[in-house]
Amino acid sequence: MKLFGKPKPKQDTQETIGKLRLTLDMLEKRQTFLQDKLEKEQEKAKVLVSQKRKREALLCLKKRNNFQNEVTKLQGSYDTLNQQIFALENAKMNMEIMNSMRDGARSLRELHGHLTIDKVDDVIEEIQEQMEIHEEISNAISQPLGNQVEDEEELLRELAEYEQEELDAQLLNIKAPSRELPQEIQVNFPTISKTVPKLSKEEEEIRALEESLAM
């Protein structure tokens, strides 16, 4: 029988972070409320001083200081909760990383549990053996039969005879090149007019004078 009742169920980290954030929100609202009260008491004290009501102004300043002290305490709690949230989030992330690494190591261990160096060597050796058998089979299949080799040689000889006959026929059809004389080059000389140009009257007189002197 348990003296203190049932044990509390284990709380999830994310749920804890959520509760801390709610507390932060509550502290922030409380700080805002007290800050507003603080500022009002300070303004009230200034008004009372201007009215020469110093005793009442002193009471307002005391209230302001009380509010200020409370705001300071709340700010300390606020900072502490922020640090806790930061630490929890980092711890949660580290835990998730470790869990992932542990799962990965477990999976590798399970996979390697079915493999050994000897098994790997056996598989590699078997693959090489099968590849050699495949190569031998391929070479055997690709080799021509004996009759096919002889037939091919005979066909090649026949083909060579055809080529020689074709070459001989081409040599017989070749004609000797004919030597042609070069063509006569025609040169066109300018024609000389056979008609005597008509002399002028003065030239006729000079010519007649020359003929008379020659007689």
Curated annotation (Swiss-Prot):
It is a peripheral membrane protein. Keywords: Coiled coil, Cytoplasmic vesicle, Endosome, Membrane, Protein transport, Transport. One of its GO terms (biological process) is late endosome to vacuole transport. This is Charged multivesicular body protein 4. It is found in: Cytoplasmic vesicle membrane; Late endosome membrane. Residues 10-173 form a coiled coil. Belongs to the SNF7 family. The gene is chmp4. GO terms for cellular component: cytoplasmic side of plasma membrane; endosome; ESCRT III complex; late endosome membrane; multivesicular body; nucleus; pathogen-containing vacuole; phagolysosome. The keyword Cytoplasm does not apply. Pfam families: Snf7. Probable core component of the endosomal sorting required for transport complex III (ESCRT-III) which is involved in multivesicular bodies (MVBs) formation and sorting of endosomal cargo proteins into MVBs. MVBs contain intraluminal vesicles (ILVs) that are generated by invagination and scission from the limiting membrane of the endosome and mostly are delivered to lysosomes enabling degradation of membrane proteins. Probable core component of the endosomal sorting required for transport complex III (ESCRT-III). ESCRT-III components are thought to multimerize to form a flat lattice on the perimeter membrane of the endosome. It comes from Dictyostelium discoideum (Social amoeba).
